[in-house]
UniProtKB/Swiss-Prot annotation:
Any Gene Ontology biological process: peptide biosynthetic process
Family statement: Belongs to the elongation factor P family.
CDD domains xref list: S1_EF-P_repeat_1, S1_EF-P_repeat_2
Any GO CC annotation of this UniProt entry: cytoplasm
Pathway named in the protein's UniProt entry: Protein biosynthesis; polypeptide chain elongation
Annotated NCBIfam families: efp, PRK00529.1
Family matches, as Pfam families: EFP, EFP_N, Elong-fact-P_C
The entry's keywords: Cytoplasm, Elongation factor, Protein biosynthesis
Keyword Cell inner membrane attributed: no
Alphabetical list of InterPro entries matching this protein: Elong-fact-P_C, NA-bd_OB-fold, Rib_uL2_dom2, Transl_elong_fac_P/YeiP, Transl_elong_KOW-like, Transl_elong_P/YeiP_cen, Transl_elong_P/YeiP_CS, Transl_elongation_fac_P
Gene: efp
Molecular function per GO: translation elongation factor activity
Protein name: Elongation factor P
């Protein structure tokens, strides 16, 4: 159990049989009446966001999440297959369970799989990944006076904006949290 006074961004709680992550919180102490905590909660499984108010000091069950480092090995009839490299145990996840993370997922990539009550909830990617540019328009020299960008499609199908000098076949580093170009890789 965790007190509503101890809520912080990223805290996970159990409500109505689901896991919720606190994405915003505000401790309110009105001049008249008792204090309360106004929160914005995001469902870890579905991604829906709700606003909920708790009394100050109210005890709420804390969701104890387990993180396991697994390696993505292959795809099998729409399922993503991951392997625990210490026990060689396989875990299968659907595209819905992986969500938006699948646009950066490559074979051999190590990811953290977050589980609750032995059920996988989400996949946490590394903060940055190196991918090959599969498709982009050619950059023309003297195209702009200042730096410009163009869309590029990566080997996984993800689309990011890259500088004009990037060409097909180059390896680039991409921030998985905000889909932004970080630089070239050798």
């Amino acid at each position: 159990m965790i007190s509503s006074n101890d809520f912080r961004t990223g805290t996970t709680i159990e409500l109505d049989g689901a896991v919720w992550r606190v994405i915003e919180f505000l401790h309110v102490k009105p001049g008249k009446g008792s204090a309360f905590v106004r929160t914005k909660l995001k469902a870890v499984q579905s991604g829906s966001v709700v606003e909920k108010t708790f009394r100050a000091g109210e005890m709420v069950p804390q969701a104890l999440l387990e993180k396991t480092t697994l390696q993505h090995t292959y795809m099998d009839s729409g399922d993503y297959v991951f392997m625990d490299m210490s026990s060689y145990e396989e875990t299968r996840l659907t595209a819905a369970q992986i969500g938006e993370s699948r646009k950066y997922l490559t074979e051999g990539m190590e990811v953290n799989v977050v589980s609750w009550n032995e059920r996988p909830l989400e996949v946490e990617l590394p903060n940055s990944v190196v991918l090959t540019v599969k498709e982009t328009d050619p950059g023309v020299k003297g195209d702009t006076a200042t730096g410009g960008t163009k869309p590029a499609i990566l080997e996984t199908g993800a689309q990011v904006m890259v500088p004009l000098f990037i060409s097909v076949g180059e390896k680039i580093k991409v921030d998985t949290r905000n889909d932004s170009y970080l630089g070239r890789e050798n």
